[in-house]
Each structure stands twice: as structure tokens, then as C-alpha cells.
Design a protein with these regions (language model features):
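Anionic N-terminal interaction surfaces
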Residues: 1-32
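Phosphoinositide-binding peripheral membrane targeting modules
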Residues: 21-68, 82
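Solvent-exposed, non-transmembrane amphipathic alpha-helical segments
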Residues: 59-60, 76, 112
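Generic hydrophobic/packing signal
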Residues: 63, 75-77, 103-106
Length: 113
């Protein structure tokens, strides 16, 4: 699932040393980027959201038969604006795989020890 971003991409410029990209999903004029540490939503110009996976409050993924799916990402902190994205049917597998990764990370972070 590891991907490579253009070095000029808004997310690429903020990656920490050793941080690995788990998913890069272009959706219309927006990109969804999931690393081993964070979730970011960006366009060519700016980051609309850039938060640690642990700072996620909720993710909703609604799939309908005849419409694009809706992905809602809600951060814990009110200062981070929730993101609502229309996901075309051809991107469902990539988004689902990214959500599985995020879910596993959230679970592992909640384990004692």
C-alpha cells in the first residue's frame, strides 16, 4: 500500500523523517493521504486537514448504489475542520483499504501497554 508523493505536494513537505505513506488517493481536485502517523486532506495549494491518526474522533463512510460515496472525517479538536468528500465508485477499494489501516491503528493505540 506504500505510495510515493511528488516532493512539492503539500503533504510531502510536512512528512517527518521515517514517516511512511500508506495510502495516496486522488479524488477530484482533492487528495487523501494516510501515513503511518497521520491523515491529511489537501488540494494542490493547501492542507485542509493534517492530523495525527490518534486525533480522529470519527470517520463515516456512506455508500449508496447510484451516487458517489460520502466520506466524513471528524477530528477530535474543534479547531480542525471536519472534511466531507464525495468518493467515486472507482475509488471505493482504495478508500476502504485506507480505512482498514486507520481502524487498525486506532485499535492498537487503545491497547494497554
Amino acid at each position: 500500500m506504500a505510495e510515493v508523493l511528488d516532493p512539492q505536494h503539500p503533504v510531502a513537505r510536512r512528512l517527518r523523517p521515517g514517516e511512511r505513506i500508506q495510502a495516496y488517493i486522488p479524488v477530484a481536485a482533492t487528495d487523501i493521504v494516510v501515513t503511518d502517523q497521520r491523515v491529511a486532506i489537501s488540494d494542490e495549494e493547501r492542507l485542509a486537514l493534517d492530523i495525527e491518526i490518534a486525533a480522529l474522533r470519527r470517520i463515516e463512510f456512506d455508500i449508496e448504489r447510484d451516487r458517489p460515496a460520502t466520506l466524513v472525517i471528524v477530528p477530535d479538536h474543534a479547531l480542525d475542520e471536519p472534511q466531507v468528500l464525495a468518493i467515486p465508485h472507482d475509488q471505493l477499494p482504495a478508500v476502504a483499504e485506507a480505512l482498514v489501516y486507520i481502524g487498525q491503528q486506532l485499535y492498537l493505540e487503545g491497547l494497554p501497554g
